[in-house]
UniProtKB/Swiss-Prot annotation:
Effect of loss of the gene: Leads to the production of pneumocandin analogs with non-hydroxylated ornithine.
Record-stated family: Belongs to the cytochrome P450 family.
Superkingdom to which the source organism belongs: Eukaryota
InterPro entries recorded: Cyt_P450, Cyt_P450_CS, Cyt_P450_E_grp-IV, Cyt_P450_sf
UniProt function note: Cytochrome P450 monooxygenase; part of the gene cluster that mediates the biosynthesis of pneumocandins, lipohexapeptides of the echinocandin family that prevent fungal cell wall formation by non-competitive inhibition of beta-1,3-glucan synthase. The 10,12-dimethylmyristoyl side chain is synthesized by the reducing polyketide synthase gloL/GLPKS4. The thioesterase gloN/GLHYD exclusively interacts with gloL/GLPKS4 to maintain turnover of the polyketide side chain.
Protein name: Cytochrome P450 monooxygenase gloO
């Protein structure tokens, strides 16, 4: 009897294990998108083990840059494609650098950036799937108005630096990245929503925390079947509303509603156009009304769009600014780059009485080269990411067929440290851009203008839509920092995983900083 029961339980256990394995295989098949990668393509850091793709994806949290570089030097340099598991989103097919122009020139009906954006937009709130309003306004209206906004941007930089870094001639220890994030959030939101909100401490604290609520959820995009993404997005939106968007909305909603009324009055001829702020929110409302978008939920949609603008701007600009400052402070003395930037920035800002125009910003050539070099070395992820949208896929010139749904790109990190492209590629040398990539007049090419060898802002019509603004924002901020403050590197951040770095309380590089006696206003 006991033997029979034992045998029965053993059989049931075996059946259970089989069913579990079958379900696990089915779940893995439904969720990972690993099967969109052509079978003949080799993977980077994918080992022979159960759930090998998911485990490679987990390891990529700490190995993203290493894997991207390995794909480039082990495969792409030999003319071969390589497959990569990435922490956020579907696996990526990395193509050799020779495909850069091919990617840029393909029509949107073949490969597109939009599905990648949409996977992220679904978590923000509102109905932003397929909505490109933010990108369009940053690319057109912000760029066209940039010259006259320089004084506004400069005013906020000056005020934010005084508030955050202070005016004391005494040395103080501070977390550079967090301080710069506050400054970036304030200057960006001065252009997004105006002076009052950008100086509201509760609002700035909230926008700084948006990414901590929303970014981790993007990991789920590659871990659930397509048919579950709709229900999941509704759940995560509810979560976001409680922990992030609710507070953000409460601070912004009144401003949005009043701005909608003011813009509508102007368009109908009963309002004063001169009293409308030239900022992103005004342009959003104008575009919404002209498109005939329903006014029923327009306030929530506009709030979601402002949230998206903040998510796109704050994290990336903060990272670029932090790296630019730290590289100059820690490596810029050798070669005289730090001294050159200090002298240039002081001459420019004092020469215009600390109220620069666009012409003054253009004079910050050495400062721009320092930022450009920092971005060259900072890039850790693939570039030119696109998703194949042609229903039958696309066949590359080398005969490789890439199915619909596959995401592809190039290893920007690898290109940027290729010794056949850059001399001493891993050495910090802003001076390299004084002699390479020059324009027809022999002047250094502007940072926002990429090429096949420099992809910090991507390339082509789908480049970073705010790259002109970001270039000026970075240059102006560094001009004020290095003309007004002394900075010494104090302590490097403790080693941490990529996931740990995006969580609250993550270790940060620390610096000592004090106000200079010269350059005070």
């Amino acid at each position: 009897m006991i033997a029979a029961l034992f045998t029965t339980n053993l059989q049931l256990g075996a059946v259970g294990v089989f069913i579990f394995a079958l379900l696990a295989f089915a779940f893995n098949k439904l969720t990972t998108w690993e099967y969109s990668i052509p079978k003949e393509v080799q993977w980077v850091d994918r080992r022979t083990q159960p759930f090998s793709y998911l485990r490679a994806k987990a390891r990529a949290l700490a190995r993203s840059k290493e894997n991207t570089l390995e794909a480039y030097f082990r495969f792409n340099k030999l003319g071969k494609a390589a497959a990569l598991a990435v922490p956020f989103g579907r696996p990526l097919l990395l193509l050799p650098q020779t495909f850069v122009r091919w990617i840029v020139d393909q029509p949107e009906s073949i490969i597109s950036l939009d599905p990648i954006h949409d996977d992220f937009h679904v978590f923000v709130g509102g109905d932003l799937t397929g909505d490109h309003t933010v990108q369009e306004l940053l690319r057109r209206e912000l760029t066209l108005n940039l010259d006259k906004l320089i004084s506004v941007i400069n005013d906020e930089i000056v005020c934010a630096l005084d508030d955050v870094l202070g005016n004391s001639p005494e040395w103080k220890s501070t977390s550079l990245a967090d301080d710069l994030k506050t400054i970036v959030a304030r200057t960006s939101n001065r252009v997004f929503v105006g002076k009052d909100l950008c100086r509201n401490k509760h609002y700035i604290s909230t926008v700084k925390g948006l990414a901590l609520v929303i970014m981790p959820e993007t990991v789920l995009q590659d871990l659930i079947p397509q048919f579950l993404k709709g229900p999941l997005s509704r759940i995560t939106k509810a979560f976001n509303n409680i922990y992030g968007m609710k507070k953000f909305s409460s601070l912004l909603l009144g401003v949005v509603r009043q701005r909608y009324i003011d813009v509508k009055d102007v368009l109908e001829g009963s309002g004063d156009k001169t009293r409308l702020p030239d900022d992103l929110l005004t342009w959003m409302v104008q575009k919404s009304i002209r498109k005939g978008e329903s006014s029923a939920n327009i306030d929530k949609l506009l709030v979601a769009r402002i949230a998206m603008a903040n998510l796109a701007a704050i994290e990336t600009t903060t990272a670029a600014m932090t790296r630019s400052v730290l590289d100059l402070v820690t490596q810029g003395s050798e070669g005289g780059f730090l001294k050159a930037v200090q002298e240039e920035t002081l001459a420019v800002v004092e020469g215009c009485n600390y109220e620069p125009s666009k012409k003054d910003v253009l004079k910050l050539v050495l400062t721009e080269n320092a930022i450009k070099e920092a971005l060259r070395l900072q890039v850790a992820f693939p570039g030119l990411m696109r998703q194949v949208v042609a229903p039958n896929g696309v066949t590359l010139e080398n005969g490789l067929h890439v199915p619909c749904g596959t995401r592809l790109g190039v290893s920007a990190a690898g290109i940027h440290v290729d010794e056949s492209i850059y001399e001493d590629p891993t050495t910090y040398n802003p001076g390299r851009f004084l002699v390479r990539d020059l324009d027809p007049r022999g002047d250094p090419s502007p940072m926002w203008k990429g090429n096949e060898n420099y992809l910090a802002f991507s390339l082509g019509r789908r480049s970073c839509p705010g790259r002109w603004y970001v270039t000026d924002q970075l240059k102006l901020t560094l001009a004020h920092i290095f003309s007004k403050y002394e900075i010494r590197f104090e302590k490097a951040a403790e080693t941490a995983s990529a996931l740990r770095k995006i969580l609250p309380g993550a270790p940060q590089d620390r610096v000592m900083i004090r106000r200079r006696s010269v350059g005070k206003r």
